[in-house]
Curated annotation (Swiss-Prot):
It is found in: Cytoplasm. Its EC number is 6.3.2.13. The keyword DNA damage does not apply. GO terms for molecular function: ATP binding; magnesium ion binding; UDP-N-acetylmuramoylalanyl-D-glutamate-2,6-diaminopimelate ligase activity. Pathway: Cell wall biogenesis; peptidoglycan biosynthesis. Its main location: cytoplasm. Meso-2,6-diaminopimelate binds at residues 406, 430-433, 481, 485. This is UDP-N-acetylmuramoyl-L-alanyl-D-glutamate--2,6-diaminopimelate ligase. It holds the Pfam family Mur_ligase_C. The gene is murE.
Length: 514
């Protein structure tokens, strides 16, 4: 079979055309595309591309015999360095640069509609992606146009998510999901877009209408190497072909650089808390929160900007959640929701699973489960709960660890943050993966001035139980790092584990209602 030639300079559409023509001529209608042999069904098309960036490599072509044995109707294979076996029992089409075409190919194969029928909103940043995407979906769904979610908690509508195991699914699965969501009634999708996903091309083929940037703090340096490379990966979303609007956190230095680099024609909204008024810089659209007041049941803040002024009463706590809500507000406005309507929806947002999720607090200590797993996120979480702890007349506990096989540089930083902001620190396992759990705890403790003040309990369930059992009735306990996760990975094996469930059990053991 002659390979379909491509050129680095040829438009994607021109490169796709012969591949689509070949598929339509040789593959039955309704066949699925997949690059995962575990998901193959009889009649499917196996897409055997090669990942060749400097940080991830993979080659699907050695799995072609397995795919053929599974009964695929055809195979698309990366052409470079590949010769179709003369006795191949299935149709195989070699394609140059197949990995770059996988997303756009799937988008056309599954007939994913454009922004007029399916508005896709991309949310990127170190922290806040899940909360913002969930809140965007909650708010837009109140308009009558159902909004789905793709992200860390899963894919689907907010009340019926299906776990995928990835923040951003692979390019083919993502386009298949977008088409399925549209057929199920979605008219918008709020999608978490990770730096890994952007760099590995998982979002390729997606027609983003609006992009939201939350923040950039240290994380994933085990993958990206430097903060500059990490920022560059995030920035790809804001140079996306066809992007109409960008909502950007101006409080973050990386946000300022994104705003400065936006191409002409992209409508921008910048937002922040206090600080210099965007109007003084001649910014077009802007939002600013001032006079932030924390109380035991949430936060109240004033918001003003180019759209109007108002006071917002939110059930969420923490300055970081004020920032996240400003970002969501900017997205709603760019999606055409009127100012007063957008504000009303903002006040009706509900907390997200594993994000500042509260348990107890009435007849026992208040326990908060949060996904904070970076230095900045842990600091923001502890700072957010400090005034609540003070109002209760108690002390603040931090129960956390750090993930194995991930950026080790953040471990001592998180130890130092916990020692500085919490009165009690319990170090425990997060997802140690292939690393020795005790070595991870020791690295966290290395960042503390007096590590003897921290209690080390490797078993996470026992650590949670210890904190709940020994906390005063007025205390606040933060169980940080895993949030919504339902498993814990130790020595390469995942086992069922839920922070929420173990918090409930610990409170019950103390005789306290969760």
């Amino acid at each position: 079979m002659t390979a379909v030639p491509t050129s680095e300079r040829a438009p994607i559409a021109a490169r796709l055309a012969p591949v689509l023509d070949w598929l339509r001529a040789h593959v039955p209608a309704g066949a699925d595309l997949t690059s995962d042999t575990r998901k193959l069904k009889t009649g499917d098309v196996f897409v055997a591309y090669v990942l060749g960036n400097v940080r991830q490599r993979g080659d699907g072509r050695p799995h072609i015999p397995q795919a053929i044995e599974a009964g695929v109707s055809a195979v698309l294979a990366e052409a470079h360095g590949y010769v179709v076996p003369a006795d191949a029992p299935a149709r195989i089409l070699p394609v140059d640069g197949l990995s770059e075409l996988a997303g756009p190919l799937a988008a056309q194969w599954y007939a994913v509609p454009g922004p007029d029928a399916l508005r896709v909103i991309g949310v990127t940043g170190t922290n806040g992606k899940t909360s913002c995407s969930q809140w965007i979906a909650q708010a837009l769904s109140r308009q009558g146009e159902r909004c789905a979610v793709v992200g860390t908690l899963g894919t689907g509508f907010v009340d019926a998510l299906v776990a995928t195991g990835f923040t951003t699914p692979d390019a083919i699965q993502l386009q298949h999901s977008l088409a399925d969501l549209h057929r199920a009634g979605a008219r918008a999708v709020a999608m978490e877009v990770s730096s890994h996903g952007l760099e590995q091309g998982r979002a390729d083929g997606t027609r983003f209408d609006i992009a939201l940037f939350t923040n950039l703090t240290q994380d994933h340096l085990d993958y990206h190497g430097t903060m500059a490379e990490y920022e560059l990966a995030k920035a790809r979303l804001f140079g996306w072909p066809g992007l109409r609007a960008a909502v950007i956190n101006r409080d973050d230095a990386a946000g300022g650089r994104l705003l400065a680099g936006l191409r002409a024609g992209i409508e921008a909204v910048e937002y922040g808390i206090d600080g210099e008024a965007a109007a003084q810089r001649g910014a077009g659209h802007w939002l600013r929160a001032t006079n932030v007041r924390a109380h035991r049941t949430g936060t109240t803040f004033d918001v003003d900007g180019s759209f109007g002024r108002a006071t917002v009463h939110s059930p969420m706590v923490g300055l970081f959640n004020v920032s996240n809500q400003l970002g969501v507000l900017g997205v709603l406005l760019m999606a055409g929701v009127p100012w007063q309507d957008a504000l009303a929806r903002l006040e009706k947002l509900q907390p997200v699973s594993g994000r500042m999720e509260r348990f107890g607090g009435e007849d026992g200590p208040l326990v908060v489960v949060d996904y904070a797993h970076t230095p900045d996120a842990l600091e923001q979480t502890l700072r957010a709960l400090a005034p609540i702890t003070g109002a209760r007349g108690g002390k603040l506990w931090a129960v956390f660890g750090c993930g194995g096989d991930r950026d080790p540089g953040k471990r001592p930083q998180m130890g130092a943050i916990a020692e500085r902001l919490a009165q009690h620190v319990v170090l425990t396992s997060d997802n140690p993966r292939s690393e020795d759990p005790q070595l991870i705890l020791d690295m966290i403790a290395d960042g503390m001035e007096d590590p003897r003040l921290a209690i080390q309990i490797e078993d996470r369930a026992a650590a949670i139980l210890h904190a709940v059992r020994h906390a005063d009735v007025h205390d606040v306990i933060v169980v940080a790092g895993k949030g919504h996760e339902s498993t814990q990975e130790i020595a390469g094996r995942k086992r069922p584990f839920s922070d929420q469930e173990h918090v409930r059990l610990a409170l019950a053991a103390r005789g306290v209602n969760a």
